[in-house]
A protein has these predicted regions:
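The feature captures the beta-strand-to-loop junction immediately N-terminal to the Walker
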Residues: 39-41
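Conserved structural motif at the start of ABC-family nucleotide-binding domains
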Residues: 8, 23-25, 79
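Conserved ABC transporter NBD signature motif
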Residues: 62-73, 77-78
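ABC-family P-loop ATPase nucleotide-binding domains
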Residues: 76, 80, 86-142
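A short, proline-enriched helix->beta-strand linker immediately N-terminal to the Walker B motif
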Residues: 149-153
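Catalytic Walker B motif of ABC-type/P-loop ATPase nucleotide-binding domains
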Residues: 155-159, 164
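ABC transporter nucleotide-binding domain
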Residues: 171-265
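C-terminal coupling/interaction segments
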Residues: 260-296
Length: 296
């Protein structure tokens, strides 16, 4: 049996602005039906990658495929199957929210009006308000409504919570994304580009960390939590001088020792136990902590 076609497949992608390479040899595969995180600091190359997927930029080397299709050759067919929310949203300023959504719905073969009504209520958006009177956060909310109502197979989100207050961010993450994926389990895919990793912790299935245009780490979320550990030991006296092969980072503070382990946690714990600490504990890293440890 052949492997299912990924929602997104990027191979050896390169894109430069003049002499400055924004993306350098990026490889990334997003299986259909998952919520995939593209993590990186500002300037890591995330938005350039998104623009290549949307055919707003053409890869200078390498390739991108969505549902097995080259967006440069199948632009309309690909765009019918996705929705995109950028980090900055602009609408026709003279239109109301209602007119804007009706206008955008006219380009779609399907539009879930029940979902639209529900989201407008949840976001407390006034359909009669002109878009030029909306705050940045409200414009983002309208864009999210417009992205989710067509119920596309693929949702591309570039810093989607930018400009939203903490309460609305939580509402968006817990309710909106959840509702989108629950509508057609296994078929709806999300690629979310963000540096606010903790906010998406419970939704991400797999992720890639980008730095300087490169993919530096790709893992399943559960795999990352099982591999990366934070180990703490407290001693009666000063921290013994010892080597800990496999520790990514070591921090000594008085009588306390903290280590970040990547796959070597059990061996490090046994070595620490032999040093007779007063206390010894370990816990899985969050995805944000994995991100920080990887780029530190």
């Amino acid at each position: 049996m052949s492997e299912p076609t990924p929602a997104i497949e990027i191979k050896d992608l390169v894109y430069a602005y003049g002499r400055a390479e924004a993306v350098h040899g990026l490889n990334l595969t997003v299986p259909a039906g998952c919520c995939y995180g593209l993590f990186g600091r500002n300037g890591a190359g995330k938005t350039t990658t998104m623009k290549c997927l949307l055919n707003l930029l053409r890869p200078q080397r390498g390739s991108v495929r969505l549902f097995g299709l080259d967006p440069a050759k199948h632009d309309v067919e690909v765009k019918r199957r996705l929705a995109y929310v950028p980090d900055y949203v602009a609408f026709y300023p003279w239109m109301t929210v209602r007119e804007t959504l009706d206008y955008l719905a006219s380009f779609r073969s399907h539009w879930n009006r029940d979902t639209e009504s529900n989201l407008l209520d949840r976001f407390q958006l006034d359909p009669g308000k002109r878009t030029d009177a909306l705050s940045k956060g409200q414009r983002t909310q309208v864009a999210l409504v417009a992205a989710i109502c067509p119920e596309p197979p693929l949702l591309l989100l570039d810093e989607p919570t930018s400009g939203l207050d903490p309460i609305v961010r939580r509402e968006f993450i817990e309710t909106v994304i959840g509702a989108y994926q629950e509508g057609d389990p296994g078929k709806r895919t999300i690629l979310v580009s963000t540096h606010l990793i903790s906010e998406f912790e419970g939704l991400i299935d797999e992720f890639t960390i980008m730095d300087g245009g490169h993919d530096v780490l790709t893992l399943g979320a559960d795999q990352a939590r099982g591999r990366y550990q934070k180990i703490r030991a407290r001693f009666a006296g000063s921290v013994p001088q010892a080597e800990f092969p496999g520790a990514l980072h070591i921090k000594r503070n008085g009588r306390e020792l903290e280590l970040i382990a990547n796959g070597g946690g059990p061996e490090i714990i046994e070595k620490l136990r032999a040093l007779s600490p007063e206390s010894l504990s370990s816990e899985a890293l969050t995805l944000e902590e994995v991100f920080v440890a990887t780029l530190k």
